[in-house]
Every structure is written in structure tokens, then in C-alpha cells.
Amino acid sequence: MAFATGITTSSNPTFLGLKISNTSLRSVVSCNSISFPSLSYVNLNLNRRNRLSVRSASVPAAPAMEGLKPAISLSENALKHLSKMRSERGEDLCLRIGVKQGGCSGMSYTMDFENRANARPDDSTIEYQGFTIVCDPKSMLFLFGMQLDYSDALIGGGFSFSNPNATQTCGCGKSFAAEM
């Protein structure tokens, strides 16, 4: 399945460049309205002033499917250790995971327990085997697909982050660089 990643117009009001994935599709049309039959929910118009407007764009929600990977996942060891830490506090807490500027590579991971009532409406809430993870929208851009692991090894133990969005990580594994 191809996804449109960019739309450009030229000085000719009937010329549309549509970038799909990593390839460019350019087509010259003789009318001011362009429709994409395979994308029946999108109808694009080019007016005479070289402006591109979207008349309608409603995407049906994907059906809930079993077996989908969560946006952020926990290894079995991380889940056990976090559950133990949460139970020691004796409260109904969730884990907030995020990123902030800093660290050896430019961005560092943040993790802390917080009361579920503190979750904001725009936060992503991920239920993972009975454990709740909360992440703000900006951090989710950098953490989507990440797996949190835990090791109790004497050397190199603790939490580790396996982040598919990281282009570079520091030696300690607590900070990373990502291109957006």
C-alpha cells in the first residue's frame, strides 16, 4: 500500500505533483478537479490561484485486531520489575515514558510513575498486559515501536530501551539521536 507523503503544485494550475512513498508521480490533467478512485474518501481540487484544497478527508477507523503490537511494549522482565516497583508504592499508578532534550546524543529518555488521574486528554494510553503506560504526543513521535527491557545484571543492568527510531545511541543507552 502506498502512502502520499507530499503534494506540490506548479505555476500551471492543472499540474499536480504527488509524492508517494519514495517515488514521485507527476500527472498533467486538463481539469481543475482531481479524484483518486482508489482513495474514495479524498477529493482534491486545484483552483485557479494555484492553491490546493481538500474538500473531504474522512478516513474510516481501522477495526480492532488481535495480535497488533502496542506503540510501546515491555519485555517480560521489565513488566515484572515495574509491577514490583508499583506494588511497593501501594497506589494505582501508571508509568509515564517520554523524551527530553539532553544527554550524550541529544535526547534522553524519561520514566516515572504517576497517578492515573494526572494523564492528560492528549496523552497516548497503552494498556500492556494489565499495566498502563502513558506518553505525551510529542514523545510518542520518537518512541513509537520502542520496547523497554530490564536486566538485573551487576554490570550493565537496569532498564534498556530498544528504539527503532534512534539513529544513534550513547554508550550508556539512556540517550539517543533521531531524525524527523
UniProtKB/Swiss-Prot annotation:
Expressing tissues: Ubiquitous with higher expression level in green, photosynthetic tissues.
Residue stretch of the organelle transit peptide: 1-55
Keyword set, alphabetical order: Chloroplast, Iron, Iron-sulfur, Metal-binding, Plastid, Transit peptide
Cofactor note: Binds 2 iron ions per dimer. The dimer may bind additional iron ions.
GO cellular component annotations of the record: chloroplast stroma
Pfam families: Fe-S_biosyn (PF01521)
GO molecular function terms attached to this record: iron-sulfur cluster binding; metal ion binding; protein-macromolecule adaptor activity
UniProt xrefs under PANTHER family: IRON-SULFUR ASSEMBLY PROTEIN ISCA, CHLOROPLASTIC
Protein name: Iron-sulfur assembly protein IscA, chloroplastic
